[in-house]
């Protein structure tokens, strides 16, 4: 069953695929479980398929939308339901901390992310995890599989390690192409990310950690001795208890953290 609010053609330049299937809309709302007074921020509200049910539950909501043509009809549809604040900007330029007012609840992020820039958006919000309670995103299933992949998996990579270091990542359910208008060529999936307690992460230098993960998976067929030759010495590996002939996909997230924290003495 389709649920379309207004006739706004999808724009390929924005990577738009509007969710229109009521069954999957309801499943997503149930997964989010919105509560009154939740501080929800939606990335890419589109035609409001998720926006309006959330607004009805919470009374207010902030949406970040780049497509100017969607703002007026979305505002009109939202007016009877509650207070909708729309930020007309690229989400990659938005500092979410300006939305997290002192004393307020942490932000809850939701969104059907444009597939062409989903990874940059994930890394952008990851940098602001301290002010986020949880995130529910719809992405290309292939990306969701990479996000939740365990060590040893063929799709375990930089995205897996970086997200799992800071968040608990859960794959919720798959959404087929025919739930969208226009339908994408691939399956989508809903993922839930819950930022970890910062006191349990214990990464001494986040830049060094990021550099090590990037370099290790940038040459994933090489042993870590070779792929990290410019970053880690034998002493780093010894102190972290990691074999130099191991490859990136064999390391647990905690082992990458140990290697980043290891001393060169």
Swiss-Prot record:
Group of enzyme by EC: transferase
A matching Pfam family: RrnaAD
Residues at which S-adenosyl-L-methionine binds: 17, 19, 44, 65, 90, 112
Name recorded for this polypeptide: Ribosomal RNA small subunit methyltransferase A
Family the entry assigns: Belongs to the class I-like SAM-binding methyltransferase superfamily. rRNA adenine N(6)-methyltransferase family. RsmA subfamily.
Record InterPro entries: KsgA/Erm, rRNA_Ade_diMease-like_C, rRNA_Ade_Mease_Trfase_CS, rRNA_Ade_methylase_Trfase_N, rRNA_adenine_dimethylase, SAM-dependent_MTases_sf
Keywords annotated in UniProt: Cytoplasm, Methyltransferase, RNA-binding, rRNA processing, S-adenosyl-L-methionine, Transferase
